[in-house]
């Protein structure tokens, strides 16, 4: 599944990033690499997603979220 399909409050593990190299490198600099845990904090109607990665909150657009493949992990209660 893609990060865009994720549910608010759930944790996911990044399996693969299928984006152009420039965007992929930027995400890696922000700490998002294969195996990283990502928690979705908000999913805006516009398509942008606010998430927490390695203790840092940031937002990404719909196109980027659709290029990040994840596997569902533990739920945040």
Where do the PLM segments sit?
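C-terminal structural segments of small proteins and small subunits
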Residues: 12, 47-77
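Short alpha-helix capping/helix-loop boundary micro-motifs
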Residues: 23-26, 36
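Ubiquitin-like/PB1-type beta-grasp interaction modules and other compact soluble beta-rich domains
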Residues: 1-6, 60
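Short, structured beta-strand/loop micro-motifs enriched in basic residues and often containing a Trp
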Residues: 10-23
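Conserved hydrophobic positions within beta-strands
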Residues: 14, 37-40
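Short, conserved secondary-structure segments in the cores of folded domains
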Residues: 2, 26-28
